[in-house]
Amino acid sequence: MKQYKAYLIDLDGTMYMGTDEIDGAKQFIDYLNVKGIPHLYVTNNSTKTPEQVTEKLREMHIDAKPEEVVTSALATADYISEQSPGASVYMLGGSGLNTALTEAGLVIKNDEHVDYVVIGLDEQVTYEKIAIATLGVRNGATFISTNPDVSIPKERGFLPGNGAITSVVSVSTGVSPQFIGKPEPIIMVKALEILGLDKSEVAMVGDLYDTDIMSGINVGMDTIHVQTGVSTLEDVQNKNVPPTYSFKDLNEAIAELEK
């Protein structure tokens, strides 16, 4: 297995499953830290701040710092502020997205006359919120969605994800949004900028082919699939572009790196 200078690492299905740590996750991060190999946690979750993500990882005894976390909310805020500094935004979403947009100097407004409409996962979504978003897009606002995940795993089962909420606005307006999170290259390019490394020097680690592995493939990066989450070994082997590597878990990846 190739020795990479850094790793981009998915969270749910790779580091943990719900509230349970996945075997090998802590060991992999400890291995990287001992070797002095940089890594970033790259997540499509827009509802949490980096501090909240870090807290969850630390509760599982997985070492993490807020500056090592790249959320779809942060990538979205960065994307908009680079295009239109100080722009006005109508948003659906949680505290993670609100904080990211505000800290980027963007102005959050609660009406349809805005520069951008941004859809993030909103667990308190209402018809009125969707109505305002729809009117905003119809009024000419640039339509952004933090991530395309149509379903998310919860204790009760798979529940509607941000892609499902986004699709309501998209179908109503006939306008397709710009997605920011995995598998789009935007969040990956942001992570590479933070690392200061070329894509050839970095590998993407994740469990879900359609988001994690495709995010690496779409940006031309090597990919490491772990069979600890959604996509099975059979799933990824049958794809037109399989991952560079596939391991039972991250313990197996460590064993390969140590050869």
UniProtKB/Swiss-Prot annotation:
Keyword terms, alphabetized: Hydrolase, Magnesium, Metal-binding
UniProt cross-references to Pfam families, sorted A to Z: Hydrolase_6, Hydrolase_like
Magnesium listed as a keyword: yes
Role according to the record: Catalyzes the dephosphorylation of 2-6 carbon acid sugars in vitro.
The protein's name in its UniProt record: Acid sugar phosphatase
Catalytic activity, EC: 3.1.3.-
Claim: Magnesium is one of the keywords in the record: yes
GO molecular function: metal ion binding; phosphatase activity
Xref: InterPro entries: HAD-like_sf (IPR036412), HAD-SF_hydro_IIA (IPR006357), HAD-SF_hydro_IIA_hyp1 (IPR006354), HAD_sf (IPR023214)
Family listed: Belongs to the HAD-like hydrolase superfamily. NagD family.
Cofactor: Mg(2+)
Domain of life: Bacteria
GO terms under cellular component: cytoplasm
Gene encoding the protein: nagD
